Design a protein with these regions (language model features):
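Conserved phosphate/metal-binding and DNA-contacting active-site motifs used
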Residues: 1-182
């Protein structure tokens, strides 16, 4: 995480609940702190903070809520097969996936719902990272050859996707992000 310059923090084992007192506000890039956490809690899950501070955001696709169909429809509407973009993608323990992009320099991406089956993980959010274990016992993993530790860089999001995400946030009003759904994967 430190090499990737992403903010991380520990989650309770096989959980999406923060292990530290202040949750994502305790997130760090500091290698010594990261080593201390996982030495103390070797079975802890890993959370990656999303948003401007980490320099990334993610689309969180959940098939249990129609996410695969929503994602296909989104790709069709944008005229872009988003899964073919060379950017990190992780498989979630619930059978969904996270598609990671560079956080844009000039726009704000807030966490929220894009559709019933797709969450936006931006400012105020986090995702459970690969090498974690879902509450159902399945592991999170990097998809194929999209592991950022193997050199895959965050791609910029397509401009059509950014326009949709920024428009969605504007239509929802400039409110403080809610954390009610932050642990949904």
């Amino acid at each position: 995480a430190e090499a990737l310059n992403w903010l991380v923090f520990p989650l309770k084992p096989q959980s999406k609940i923060p292990l530290t007192q202040h949750g994502f506000k305790d997130a760090t890039r500091n290698a010594d702190q990261i080593i201390q956490w996982w030495t103390q809690y070797p079975d802890a899950n890993i959370a990656i903070v999303t948003g401007a501070e980490s320099g990334l955001f993610a689309l969180d696709v959940d098939p249990r809520n129609g996410g695969n169909e929503d994602f296909d429809q989104l790709s069709t509407e944008l005229g872009i097969n988003l899964q073919l973009i060379n950017t990190p993608q992780s498989l979630t323990g619930s059978g969904g996936f996270h598609l990671f992009f560079q956080y844009p320099a000039t726009q704000v991406i807030r966490s929220g719902k894009l559709s019933a089956g797709i969450d936006i993980k931006g400012d105020g959010g986090y995702v459970v990272a690969p090498h974690s274990i879902h509450p159902n016992g399945r592991a999170y993993a990097w998809e194929g050859e999209s592991d950022p530790q193997e050199g895959i860089m965050l791609a910029p999001a397509p401009s059509k996707l950014l326009a949709l995400l920024v428009g969605k946030a504007a239509s929802q009003g400039a409110t403080v992000p809610t954390y009610r759904n932050q642990w949904v994967d």
